[in-house]
């Protein structure tokens, strides 16, 4: 159904706000959750993700018009995380059946990386995100992501005794 505008033209019927928000959460929500969980750990990351989606819903008219809403909401998540008690990031050690085994020192070594290095390494090497996608979500340049990944992997290799 088309809507007749005041100028006499027709516009397609607008997409309901709920539908566009649901589509956004479905398409980008997992990426945002993964980025926030990689940054803040499972417990805080999940809580912050919920806070961010609540904020996005309240501000949907403004957020939906942004060129990079995921990147913006990641920054909102950084601010929201400040409300949570400062705790060291605890990465889960258990992994799903069928996943490759990993060195049990790895979670501890990941915790020792800088926040930016850890997020970049997890997004690129564990979640298999591209450098451009990671850069977009984090709101940094692709070369910054490459640098963080390179330095993070170098630190991990050194810690595991596999220095190149």
What do the PLM-derived regions correspond to, one by one?
Residues 78, 138-164:
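DNA-recognition helix of helix-turn-helix
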Residues 24, 28-32, 36, 52, ...:
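Residue-level preference for hydrophobic side chains embedded in well-ordered alpha helices
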Residues 13-23, 33-51, 61-67, 164:
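Short, charged helix-capping/linker segments at alpha-helix termini
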Residues 58-65, 75-94:
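Arg/Lys-rich amphipathic alpha helix in sigma70-family domain 2
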Residues 32, 36, 45-56, 134, ...:
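Short, small-hydrophobic-rich alpha-helical interface motif
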Residues 36-39, 105-113:
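Short amphipathic alpha-helical boundary/capping segments
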Residues 100, 110-118:
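Short helix-coil-helix linker/hinge
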Residues 120-124:
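A short pre-motif secondary-structure segment
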């Amino acid at each position: 159904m088309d809507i007749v505008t005041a100028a006499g033209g027709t516009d397609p019927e607008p997409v309901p706000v709920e539908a566009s928000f649901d589509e956004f959460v479905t398409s980008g929500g997992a990426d945002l959750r993964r980025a926030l969980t990689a940054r803040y750990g499972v417990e805080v990351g999940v809580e912050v993700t919920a806070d961010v989606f609540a904020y996005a819903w309240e501000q949907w008219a403004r957020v939906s018009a942004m060129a990079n809403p995921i990147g913006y909401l990641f920054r909102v998540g950084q601010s929201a995380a400040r409300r949570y008690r400062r705790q060291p990031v605890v990465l889960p050690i258990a992994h799903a059946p069928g996943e490759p085994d990993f060195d049990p020192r790895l979670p501890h070594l990941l915790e020792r990386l800088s926040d930016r290095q850890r997020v970049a390494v997890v997004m690129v090497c564990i979640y298999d995100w591209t450098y451009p996608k990671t850069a977009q979500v984090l709101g940094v340049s692709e070369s910054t992501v490459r640098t963080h990944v390179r330095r993070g992997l170098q630190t991990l290799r050194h810690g595991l005794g596999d220095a190149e």
